[in-house]
A protein has these predicted regions:
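Residue-level detector of structured alpha->beta connecting loops
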Residues: 83, 133-134, 172, 200
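Conserved alpha-helical substructure of the radical SAM core
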Residues: 2-133
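A broadly conserved sequence feature marking short terminus-proximal activation segments
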Residues: 2-24, 269-295
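Radical SAM enzyme [4Fe-4S]-AdoMet core and its adjacent flexible, acidic
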Residues: 140-142, 147-285, 289
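Hydrophobic faces of well-ordered beta-strands that scaffold small-molecule active sites
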Residues: 40, 85-87, 113-115, 137-139, ...
Length: 304
């Protein structure tokens, strides 16, 4: 694998849950605590050009885009408090978001910014994306060939996306593949590594999160098989590994400090705010950036 490092991230949602609940349950949050958000994910649209089996979106025919001015006002509240959280822009397909470049103009100010994309439009958008510093792109590639890609993505764009990503990487864009392993592909994970080595595009690979959707239940990995896989990759050399233990350690999860409530936030395409990507049900609703102030949103969170 030469000197290139493949990064492995594992876990079954425990990191996302722990970020919110450790403080709520272990320490209790009865007294006034400080708020320090390190990372915000904005699902800017539910418009998408794919229909993936494992996606937690409802895949509507009609779509809604978040108001970019509301995002900017919301982030200005953090700025006025001396905070500049890292930003992830997701969807849907964020490259279809009509105000993507206006948002990037604002957030690409030296902080870490990532766009999660399926890569289909990457070559078309490449020239503009190259203008932004501190921007990275994560290209979802959940199959290692056209057949396994179709099993998840329901289309035959595999070769096109691989080529788009390789072209973007060679042009100087900070881009990498993100592979989500399922029970169909976990035994062939080395083929993802081979694809990464062939294209020279970096790779992040992790098991599929289980959010309870029926199609995800069909694809989820059994616990024993997941443990065996983790042991196998630990035996490999030149691999940076982030396992479940690391994910919930105090050093990597700031939420574990009792005077801090939040480490992450997720804002959906309608402006609704939740503690993280996996906690989107009604009981975790914190407020809406279009109608609630910063203080109202975090006071709602304390009442959950």
């Amino acid at each position: 694998m030469d000197n290139k490092i493949h990064q492995w991230k594992t876990g079954n949602g425990i990191n996302a849950v722990s970020r919110f609940w450790t403080c709520k349950c272990l320490f209790g949050v009865k007294e006034k605590c400080s708020v320090r958000v390190n990372y915000i994910m904005f699902d800017v649209t539910d418009h998408c050009n794919f229909r993936c089996k494992h996606c937690y979106k409802n895949q509507p025919d009609d779509y809604t885009d978040i108001n970019v001015d509301n995002i900017i006002l919301f982030l200005n509240e953090f700025k006025s408090r001396g905070q500049r959280p890292s930003i992830v822009i997701s969807g849907g397909e964020p490259l279809l978001y009509k105000d993507l470049y206006k948002l990037l103009d604002y957030v690409c100010d030296g902080r870490s910014v990532r766009v999660n994309t399926n890569g289909l439009l990457l070559q078309k958008k490449l020239d503009k994306l190259l203008n932004y510093k501190n921007l990275s792109l994560q290209v979802s590639l959940d199959g290692y060939d056209d057949e396994t890609f179709f099993e998840i993505r329901n289309n035959h764009y595999f070769d096109r996306i691989v080529e788009n990503t390789r072209t973007a990487f060679q042009a100087g864009l900070n881009v990498y593949f993100r592979a989500t392993l399922t029970n169909k592909t976990i035994s062939h994970y080395e083929k993802f590594i081979a694809l990464s080595d062939k294209t020279e595009v970096p790779l992040v690979i992790r098991p599929m999160y289980n959010t309870g959707e029926v199609e995800q239940q069909k694809l989820k990995i059994g616990f024993e098989e997941l443990c065996e896989w983790q042991q196998n990759i630990l035996k490999r050399g030149q691999i940076k590994y982030t396992g479940g233990k690391d994910l919930i350690s105090e050093s990597s999860c700031p939420l574990l400090h009792k005077d801090l409530i939040y480490s992450t936030l997720t804002v959906d395409n309608r402006g609704n705010v939740y503690p993280c990507q996996l906690l989107r049900s009604r009981q975790f609703y914190m407020g809406n950036i279009s109608s609630d102030t910063y203080d109202m949103i975090f006071s709602h969170g304390e009442e959950m």
